[in-house]
């Protein structure tokens, strides 16, 4: 037996939690920022320490240590008992818009009755009560008086913020069903690299397997689902930024799959000596031309292009891909890279801005988990993948041995990176 006074791993975790919580608390008090409360219906979406690197590091340390301590003290069966009811309950709340049926009132108000909420939906009072009381066990809604519901920070966000509803809807309606079908997809199509042979395609199957469709094909036929997906991808990109403007951009830059051009607009404002071309499919290019600021029209242009087709812009200085390759398996990613080669001049640079998968244990578990989650999502949705530094280099070598690795630069906390390759024929 260990002496009671001996420091153990669990006590060290607890001490870390206390020490780092004190740092977070001191920062919030010094900045006159509100302390986190479950009943704060005006709580910000961003972490309370997001604007200070030291305080944010302490906050992450608290979260990581707390999760590890909880896992240790809960026993080995706890991680195996996945709480499927949480996903189902949350999907039901979003589907029936229950959060919006609860009034956004001050914390000392009695709230909205279960009966009143039910009257705003097609559900019975009994069902509403059971659903919301289930959510309350996870700090989503609260019951300040018997039979009455008030918002917590989480439910208030769900009520007032349409983007949050879109994100939750995408997770519960699209990603969760796709993830459930991953075992069947892997059994049906072992080692497939095709985007229409996935958990998503099985979850959305209609008719025979000959009618299998990729996520892109499904969204082409459903404007609302496509809209929601687009909103969520914008949120993901803003949540994992990279200071692209700090890199050198000069000469002619081609942003391949660049959407409506927002990344290029920002770069063009800061790099006055560079010219930019944004490439994407026809509808997206048309939208981008309408959004192009007048002051940039002499240096930014749009070109219709499918990145599997030969690159039409020849002899550019930089060809740029942002969050493109993770949607595609190695087979198709190599095809995209090879479509560039006929257009490349000696010394041309290919820059990739993507999530960089860390080595096991290289980053805090909370951060690594984000990368692993994204990688599994790519498997379930598209047979795509997130890649580490070595895999990026192997991918470009597979496309051609004339690509030389230039650099790999990351930004805290270490997930997002820019990887550059130079064409040396």
Swiss-Prot record:
Highest taxon of the lineage: Eukaryota
This enzyme's EC code(s): 2.1.1.-
Induction: Expression is up-regulated more than 10 fold in toxin producing cultures.
One term of GO molecular function: O-methyltransferase activity
Binding site for S-adenosyl-L-methionine: 257-258, 280, 306-307, 322-323
Annotated pathway: Mycotoxin biosynthesis
Transmembrane residue ranges: none
Family: Belongs to the class I-like SAM-binding methyltransferase superfamily. Cation-independent O-methyltransferase family.
Name of this protein: O-methyltransferase AMT9
Naturally occurring in which organism (per UniProt): Alternaria alternata (Alternaria rot fungus)
Lineage: Eukaryota, Fungi, Dikarya, Ascomycota, Pezizomycotina
Gene behind the chain: AMT9
